[in-house]
Protein backbone atom coordinates (compact mmCIF):
# COMPACT_ATOMS: atom_id res chain seq x y z
CA UNK A 1 0.00 0.00 0.00
CA UNK A 2 2.81 2.40 0.81
CA UNK A 3 5.92 1.21 -0.99
CA UNK A 4 5.17 2.15 -4.59
CA UNK A 5 4.38 5.77 -3.77
CA UNK A 6 8.02 6.75 -3.34
CA UNK A 7 7.98 7.75 -7.02
CA UNK A 8 5.60 10.63 -6.40
CA UNK A 9 8.43 12.74 -4.99
CA UNK A 10 10.53 12.05 -8.11
CA UNK A 11 8.10 13.68 -10.54
CA UNK A 12 8.67 17.24 -11.70
CA UNK A 13 6.57 19.81 -13.50
CA UNK A 14 6.90 18.46 -17.06
CA UNK A 15 6.63 15.28 -19.10
CA UNK A 16 9.53 15.67 -21.51
CA UNK A 17 8.96 14.42 -25.07
CA UNK A 18 10.99 14.65 -28.28
CA UNK A 19 9.96 13.66 -31.79
CA UNK A 20 12.33 11.60 -34.00
CA UNK A 21 14.08 14.84 -35.02
CA UNK A 22 14.40 15.83 -31.37
CA UNK A 23 11.98 18.72 -31.58
CA UNK A 24 10.79 19.47 -28.08
CA UNK A 25 7.17 18.41 -27.50
CA UNK A 26 7.19 18.51 -23.72
CA UNK A 27 3.99 19.09 -21.78
CA UNK A 28 3.16 20.19 -18.29
CA UNK A 29 2.55 17.33 -15.87
CA UNK A 30 -1.10 18.16 -15.22
CA UNK A 31 -1.79 18.94 -18.88
CA UNK A 32 -0.37 15.58 -19.93
CA UNK A 33 -2.37 13.74 -17.30
CA UNK A 34 -5.65 15.41 -18.24
CA UNK A 35 -5.18 15.16 -22.01
CA UNK A 36 -4.75 11.49 -23.03
CA UNK A 37 -5.37 12.39 -26.69
CA UNK A 38 -2.04 14.19 -26.69
CA UNK A 39 -0.24 10.88 -26.23
CA UNK A 40 -0.58 9.97 -29.90
CA UNK A 41 -1.40 13.45 -31.18
CA UNK A 42 -5.09 12.55 -31.58
CA UNK A 43 -4.30 9.43 -33.58
CA UNK A 44 -1.69 10.86 -35.94
CA UNK A 45 1.07 8.81 -34.28
CA UNK A 46 1.25 5.07 -33.78
CA UNK A 47 1.47 3.78 -30.23
CA UNK A 48 5.14 2.98 -30.81
CA UNK A 49 5.89 6.48 -32.12
CA UNK A 50 4.04 8.10 -29.24
CA UNK A 51 5.80 5.99 -26.64
CA UNK A 52 9.11 6.66 -28.37
CA UNK A 53 8.73 10.41 -27.97
CA UNK A 54 8.20 9.97 -24.24
CA UNK A 55 11.13 7.57 -23.93
CA UNK A 56 13.41 10.04 -25.73
CA UNK A 57 12.32 12.80 -23.38
CA UNK A 58 12.08 11.05 -20.05
CA UNK A 59 15.41 9.23 -20.39
CA UNK A 60 17.03 12.67 -20.63
CA UNK A 61 15.06 14.24 -17.81
CA UNK A 62 16.48 14.36 -14.29
CA UNK A 63 13.91 13.36 -11.71
CA UNK A 64 13.46 15.07 -8.39
CA UNK A 65 15.05 13.54 -5.32
CA UNK A 66 13.35 10.82 -3.32
CA UNK A 67 12.54 12.91 -0.30
CA UNK A 68 9.62 14.47 1.53
CA UNK A 69 8.88 17.11 -1.09
CA UNK A 70 6.35 16.92 -3.91
CA UNK A 71 6.28 19.17 -6.96
CA UNK A 72 3.69 21.96 -7.03
CA UNK A 73 1.52 20.36 -9.71
CA UNK A 74 0.86 17.36 -7.46
CA UNK A 75 0.67 19.34 -4.26
CA UNK A 76 -1.67 22.11 -5.38
CA UNK A 77 -3.35 21.08 -8.63
CA UNK A 78 -3.85 17.32 -8.73
CA UNK A 79 -6.27 16.36 -11.54
CA UNK A 80 -6.68 20.05 -12.23
CA UNK A 81 -8.34 20.48 -8.83
CA UNK A 82 -7.03 22.03 -5.60
CA UNK A 83 -5.99 18.61 -4.26
CA UNK A 84 -2.78 17.54 -2.54
CA UNK A 85 -1.46 14.12 -3.58
CA UNK A 86 0.78 13.82 -0.54
CA UNK A 87 -2.09 14.41 1.86
CA UNK A 88 -4.27 11.96 -0.08
CA UNK A 89 -1.56 9.32 0.19
CA UNK A 90 -1.46 9.72 3.95
CA UNK A 91 -5.25 9.38 4.13
CA UNK A 92 -5.18 6.27 1.94
CA UNK A 93 -2.55 4.69 4.12
CA UNK A 94 -4.58 5.31 7.25
CA UNK A 95 -7.76 3.96 5.64
CA UNK A 96 -5.90 0.83 4.56
CA UNK A 97 -4.52 0.26 8.04
CA UNK A 98 -0.89 1.09 7.28
CA UNK A 99 1.16 1.17 10.48
CA UNK A 100 2.75 4.33 11.77
CA UNK A 101 6.44 4.91 11.13
CA UNK A 102 7.50 3.68 14.56
CA UNK A 103 5.15 0.70 14.43
CA UNK A 104 6.67 -0.34 11.11
CA UNK A 105 10.21 0.10 12.40
CA UNK A 106 9.42 -1.99 15.48
CA UNK A 107 8.06 -4.75 13.25
CA UNK A 108 11.08 -4.65 10.93
CA UNK A 109 13.47 -4.72 13.88
CA UNK A 110 11.67 -7.71 15.39
CA UNK A 111 12.03 -9.56 12.09
CA UNK A 112 15.63 -8.65 11.32
CA UNK A 113 17.39 -7.73 14.55
CA UNK A 114 18.94 -4.79 12.66
CA UNK A 115 19.41 -2.05 15.25
CA UNK A 116 19.18 0.59 12.52
CA UNK A 117 15.49 -0.29 12.27
CA UNK A 118 14.60 0.20 15.92
CA UNK A 119 11.84 2.60 16.86
CA UNK A 120 12.84 6.22 17.21
CA UNK A 121 13.02 6.98 20.92
CA UNK A 122 12.51 10.74 20.72
CA UNK A 123 12.23 13.70 18.36
CA UNK A 124 15.95 14.45 18.61
CA UNK A 125 16.85 10.99 17.32
CA UNK A 126 14.24 11.30 14.59
CA UNK A 127 15.58 14.70 13.52
CA UNK A 128 19.14 13.40 13.37
CA UNK A 129 18.04 10.83 10.79
CA UNK A 130 16.19 13.22 8.49
CA UNK A 131 17.66 13.87 5.07
CA UNK A 132 16.58 17.52 5.40
CA UNK A 133 17.14 18.45 9.07
CA UNK A 134 14.99 21.59 8.85
CA UNK A 135 11.99 19.37 8.09
CA UNK A 136 11.76 18.56 11.80
CA UNK A 137 9.90 21.87 12.11
CA UNK A 138 7.09 20.61 9.89
CA UNK A 139 6.95 17.20 11.54
CA UNK A 140 6.66 18.81 14.96
CA UNK A 141 4.01 21.23 13.74
CA UNK A 142 1.96 18.37 12.32
CA UNK A 143 2.42 15.68 14.98
CA UNK A 144 3.96 17.27 18.07
CA UNK A 145 1.85 17.29 21.22
CA UNK A 146 3.63 20.02 23.15
CA UNK A 147 0.99 22.43 24.51
CA UNK A 148 2.56 25.33 22.64
CA UNK A 149 1.87 23.43 19.40
CA UNK A 150 -1.52 21.93 20.16
CA UNK A 151 -2.69 25.25 21.57
CA UNK A 152 -1.86 27.10 18.35
CA UNK A 153 -4.83 27.84 16.13
CA UNK A 154 -3.27 28.13 12.68
CA UNK A 155 -0.65 26.29 10.67
CA UNK A 156 1.65 29.30 10.83
CA UNK A 157 1.33 29.47 14.60
CA UNK A 158 2.05 25.75 14.96
CA UNK A 159 5.20 26.11 12.87
CA UNK A 160 6.25 29.16 14.90
CA UNK A 161 5.81 27.13 18.08
CA UNK A 162 7.84 24.27 16.61
CA UNK A 163 10.61 26.67 15.60
CA UNK A 164 10.85 27.97 19.16
CA UNK A 165 11.08 24.43 20.52
CA UNK A 166 13.88 23.51 18.12
CA UNK A 167 15.80 26.78 17.91
CA UNK A 168 15.21 28.13 21.40
CA UNK A 169 15.42 31.82 22.20
CA UNK A 170 12.99 34.28 23.71
CA UNK A 171 9.59 32.71 24.17
CA UNK A 172 10.79 29.11 23.94
CA UNK A 173 9.04 26.79 26.42
CA UNK A 174 11.21 25.82 29.41
CA UNK A 175 10.72 22.11 28.73
CA UNK A 176 11.67 22.30 25.04
CA UNK A 177 14.83 20.22 25.49
CA UNK A 178 13.00 17.62 27.55
CA UNK A 179 10.32 17.42 24.86
CA UNK A 180 12.87 16.85 22.09
CA UNK A 181 14.95 14.37 24.08
CA UNK A 182 11.97 12.46 25.45
CA UNK A 183 12.85 12.91 29.10
CA UNK A 184 11.26 14.14 32.34
CA UNK A 185 7.78 13.00 31.42
CA UNK A 186 8.08 13.15 27.65
CA UNK A 187 8.55 10.07 25.47
CA UNK A 188 7.78 8.86 21.96
CA UNK A 189 4.28 7.91 23.05
CA UNK A 190 3.38 11.20 24.69
CA UNK A 191 5.24 13.61 22.40
CA UNK A 192 3.40 12.69 19.20
CA UNK A 193 6.32 10.87 17.58
CA UNK A 194 4.33 7.63 17.65
CA UNK A 195 1.78 9.19 15.30
CA UNK A 196 4.16 10.05 12.44
CA UNK A 197 2.79 8.36 9.35
CA UNK A 198 4.69 5.80 7.35
CA UNK A 199 4.88 7.25 3.85
CA UNK A 200 7.66 5.69 1.88
CA UNK A 201 6.88 7.77 -1.18
CA UNK A 202 8.37 10.74 0.64
CA UNK A 203 11.52 9.29 2.07
CA UNK A 204 12.47 11.75 4.74
CA UNK A 205 15.37 9.77 6.10
CA UNK A 206 19.04 9.37 5.40
CA UNK A 207 21.48 6.55 5.82
CA UNK A 208 19.73 3.18 5.61
CA UNK A 209 17.86 2.87 2.31
CA UNK A 210 15.06 3.70 4.59
CA UNK A 211 11.84 2.25 3.41
CA UNK A 212 10.72 3.22 6.83
CA UNK A 213 11.18 6.91 6.99
CA UNK A 214 8.53 9.38 7.22
CA UNK A 215 5.91 11.48 5.68
CA UNK A 216 5.33 14.72 3.91
CA UNK A 217 3.55 17.57 5.61
CA UNK A 218 0.44 18.50 3.66
CA UNK A 219 1.54 22.13 3.59
CA UNK A 220 5.22 21.52 2.78
Question: What is each stretch, according to the model?
Answer:
Residues 1-220:
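Terminal regions of secretory-pathway proteins
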Amino acid sequence: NVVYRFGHSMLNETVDRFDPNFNDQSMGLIEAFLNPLAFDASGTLTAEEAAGSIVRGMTRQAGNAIDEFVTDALRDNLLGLPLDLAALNLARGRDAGAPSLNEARASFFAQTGDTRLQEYANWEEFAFNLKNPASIINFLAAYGTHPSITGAATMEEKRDAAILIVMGGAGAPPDAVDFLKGQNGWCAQSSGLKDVDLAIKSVGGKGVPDVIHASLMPWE
